[in-house]
Design a protein with these regions (language model features):
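Alpha-to-beta junction loops
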Residues: 59-61, 77-94
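Extracytoplasmic "Venus flytrap"
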Residues: 30-47, 68-72
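Short helix-initiation/N-cap motifs at beta->coil->alpha
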Residues: 65-79
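Contiguous mixed-secondary-structure segments that line small-molecule binding/active-site clefts
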Residues: 8-10, 51, 92-141
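Short, polar/charged alpha-helical segment
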Residues: 39-64, 125, 129
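Short, low-complexity disordered leader/linker segments with a strong preference
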Residues: 1-28
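Structural recognition of the beta-strand scaffold that forms the well-ordered cores
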Residues: 30-31, 63, 88-92, 141
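Short loop->beta-strand "edge-of-pocket" segments that line small-molecule binding or catalytic clefts
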Residues: 29-30, 35-36, 135-141
Length: 141
């Protein structure tokens, strides 16, 4: 999860059987983004995540990235993932404040934490647990 964006993933349920990587089917998730992928730091992060996920999975897991508005409006990404219309999405946590009022507390805000402070808080002081608790009722992980 970055300072200005988050990858929203919908749980697909518990694993029933264990299979080897060569037997695993290819997974391709439609992933709309809130920011154009041409924008440094705002939109290009999801391309890096997509590349790394594909590399780590041996090409078995692919994020099919869609530019803003191609699948759903930017403000509707979280709701679309929650409803099961999309498998994943990349958005800014602050866009969810109408549905999840506490999200501004965990998103980038003016005069807030510096990036290194935010990262320390998120990973070492309970920020990640707070974000997970806020999004869990929406089936977003």
């Amino acid at each position: 999860m970055g300072l200005v964006g988050a990858l929203s993933l919908r749980s697909t349920g518990p694993l029933q059987n264990t299979i080897t990587a060569s037997e695993a089917p290819q997974i391709k998730w439609r992933t709309p983004v809130a920011f154009g992928t041409h924008l440094p730091a705002l939109g290009d992060n999801i391309l890096y995540v997509s590349e790394q996920l594909s590399r780590a999975s041996g090409g078995r897991v692919l994020l099919d990235v869609y530019e803003p508005g191609m699948l759903v409006p930017a403000f509707s990404i979280t709701e679309s993932v929650k409803a099961g219309k999309l498998e994943a999405g990349y958005t800014w946590l602050g866009y969810d404040q109408g549905r999840i009022p506490a999200t501004p507390l965990i998103s980038a805000v003016p005069f807030g934490l510096e990036p290194w402070e935010y990262t320390a808080w998120y990973y070492e002081a309970g920020g990640k647990a707070l974000a997970e608790a806020l999004y869990a009722p929406h089936n977003i992980h």
